[in-house]
A protein has these predicted regions:
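C-terminal binding/interaction regions
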Residues: 28-32, 36-47, 104-173
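Compact, glycine-rich, soluble single-domain proteins
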Residues: 76-88
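Hydrophobic "anchor" residues
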Residues: 70-71, 153
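Short beta-strand scaffold segments in enzyme catalytic cores
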Residues: 59-65
Length: 173
């Protein structure tokens, strides 16, 4: 009886997962045009300017490209007790998901100390928690992460490169 219930659960879980809205579409990689990349980076810098970072002075901005073309900005928001601090990437994802959007193609991320001029400093890769949030909603084979210093100086990675052997929803089935 237990084995039969487990089998039924597995069949149902596989059906639900394979029929999730946009699941099959996530397998298709979208080629990002240069102007789209530059716009994402520009919007990430706009978001970075809104960061609330009174403690670290390290401002991060993100611009998340949804499957339909809409862009969601996010900035990091610090808190005096540190634990409730939220990263820019998660802010962008949570804004989109709270509006019912769960399919994404790319994200641009910029970050640096507030006093460092644009184009100087270093690239700002996402933290482990943000990579895991990306893995929840994005196909690691196709989702593109743009790490930028400026609109013309950037690197593009696939999620699978920044989160190899990532744990995702299909691992719970």
């Amino acid at each position: 009886m237990v084995q039969k219930c487990a089998s039924l659960f597995l069949v149902r879980a596989l059906w639900v997962h394979s029929n999730r809205k946009g699941y099959r579409d996530r397998m298709e990689e979208k080629k990002l045009e240069k102007n789209v990349i530059e716009d994402l980076i520009h919007q990430a810098f706009e978001a970075q300017a809104k960061a609330y970072v009174p403690y670290s002075q390290f401002a991060v901005g993100a611009a998340l490209l949804a499957r339909g073309g809409r862009i969601y900005q996010g900035c990091n928001i610090e808190n005096a007790s540190y634990t409730p601090t939220n990263c820019a990437e998660r802010t962008a994802f949570f804004k989109a998901v709270s509006e019912g959007i769960t399919e994404f193609d790319a994200i641009a991320i910029v970050g640096n100390k507030k006093f460092v001029p644009k184009g100087e400093g270093d690239y700002c890769p996402p933290c482990g928690v943000c990579r895991q949030v990306m893995r929840e909603f994005c196909n690691p084979e196709t989702f593109q992460i743009i790490l930028a210093k400026s609109e013309t100086e950037y690197h593009i990675y696939k999620l699978k490169e920044l989160l190899p052997l990532g744990f995702g929803p299909e691992d719970l089935i």
